[in-house]
């Protein structure tokens, strides 16, 4: 379903852009596990949570994400299931709910030993399982933790998995697109003027 939505969203946007004589965009897709973790950290490399600190409550005792703080106590954080994404503050990249609310699918295949053989400069591990492959090959990495998870799963570096052919009330997805640079008219932030890039749109 995630990939079908990405195809639909790409076609819809490109159809609109084409009708307005604008350059077509790259395909929407699921992020890799590495991209997802980088985004969740928000530029704060050594902090365990997207909000920056080592705690899951702020100084006033309020929870910083939607998760299960105690056994069976789903309402302790103010949300029984999912909540509006704007219910909690974004991270330093301006992204909401990078931990808690719903865990998120990635495009990365799950393998417990992936860090033993993954290449540092291209750490994504992708396997497109066939229907008759074993269940282990149908596992995809999920990140971020959800409303039903304990605080451990909200950690930026915690990884778990779910089977790619299943749908769960506690797993969602986030679209990403590869950024290739500027195209067309851009705003010169330094001078506040509109500039034209080297690529001319026909």
Named regions from a protein language model:
Residues 1-156, 184-186, 190-198:
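Functional-site microenvironments in short loops/helix caps that host divalent-cation chemistry
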Residues 201-202:
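Short, solvent-exposed mixed-charge patches
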Residues 169-185:
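Short, structured beta-strand segments at or near domain termini in extracellular proteins/domains
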């Amino acid at each position: 379903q995630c990939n079908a939505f990405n195809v639909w969203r790409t076609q819809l946007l490109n159809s609109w852009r084409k009708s307005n004589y604008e350059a077509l965009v790259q395909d929407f897709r699921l992020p890799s596990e590495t991209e997802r973790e980088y985004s969740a950290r928000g530029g704060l490399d050594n902090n365990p949570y997207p909000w920056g600190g080592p705690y899951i409550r702020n100084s006033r005792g309020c929870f910083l994400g939607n998760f299960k703080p105690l056994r069976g106590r789903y309402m302790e954080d103010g949300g029984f299931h999912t909540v509006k994404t704007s219910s909690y503050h974004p991270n330093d990249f301006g992204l909401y709910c990078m931990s808690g609310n719903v865990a998120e699918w990635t495009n990365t295949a799950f393998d417990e030993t992936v860090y033993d053989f993954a290449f540092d400069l291209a750490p994504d591990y992708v396997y497109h399982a066939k229907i008759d492959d074993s269940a282990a090959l149908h596992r995809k990495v999920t990140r971020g933790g959800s409303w039903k998870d304990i605080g451990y799963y909200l950690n930026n570096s915690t990884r778990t998995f779910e089977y790619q052919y299943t749908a769960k009330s506690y797993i969602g997805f986030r679209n990403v697109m590869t950024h290739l640079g500027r195209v067309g008219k851009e705003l010169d932030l330094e001078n506040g003027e509109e500039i034209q890039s080297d690529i001319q749109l026909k």
